[in-house]
Amino acid sequence: MLGDHGSGYWIGRKALRAAAADLDRRGPSTTITRGVVEALGLPRGCTVQGLIGKTKELRPADVASFAQIVLSAQDDKIASIILAAGASELVTTVRSVGAEHVILAGGLLAPSTSHKYQRPNTLRAMVEDSLGGCTYASHPVVGACWAAGRLRGVELHKVDLMNALEVRSDSRRR
């Protein structure tokens, strides 16, 4: 992968590295470790070798799923460092494009009520505070259509776009 800094995969990889460093006693203790160990189905008191063995099987989407552990542990010092770095990376990416208005999409930036752990979304708050003027779209396609309409001076409603997207995807399943 060439980029995707601050993404779920990026944060998930940082979580795995933090857990490995904790288990190996090369890094600080973090509550992320417990979440990673449980998610991988490893026994308590496992070794870093056990963790490494399990991570060899992981697909990118599996790695990205560990980002939720970091979001749920945002009071943990290491988790807050990872989230701050992720937010900084996302902001840097957006600023490099020079966009006037940003549409956030994706699970990590979803409102906190849609997260498994029901915690305030610190990552999203950090990104919004740095950029200002952000809009959230529940699906990237909705955000892209909304932005395209805005560029052309056409007002599109995100809810209508999302409903159209759902209808279209349902018809393909039949």
What are these regions (language model features)?
Residues 1-42:
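Glycine-rich phosphate-binding loop plus the immediately following alpha-helix
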Residues 47-100, 137:
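Adenine-nucleotide phosphate-binding core of ATP-dependent small-molecule kinases
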Residues 114, 122-174:
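Glycine-rich phosphate-binding/hydrolytic loop that grips phosphoryl groups
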Residues 10-13, 84, 92, 142, ...:
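A broad detector of short, well-ordered amphipathic alpha-helices
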Residues 13-21, 72, 146-150:
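Short glycine/serine- and small hydrophobic-enriched flexible loop segments
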Residues 83, 95-127:
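Glycine-rich phosphate-binding loops at beta-strand->alpha-helix junctions
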Residues 7-12, 62, 66, 123, ...:
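Catalytic-loop motifs flanking and including active-site residues across diverse enzymes
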Residues 34-46, 92-93, 163-174:
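Short, mixed-charge aromatic SLiMs
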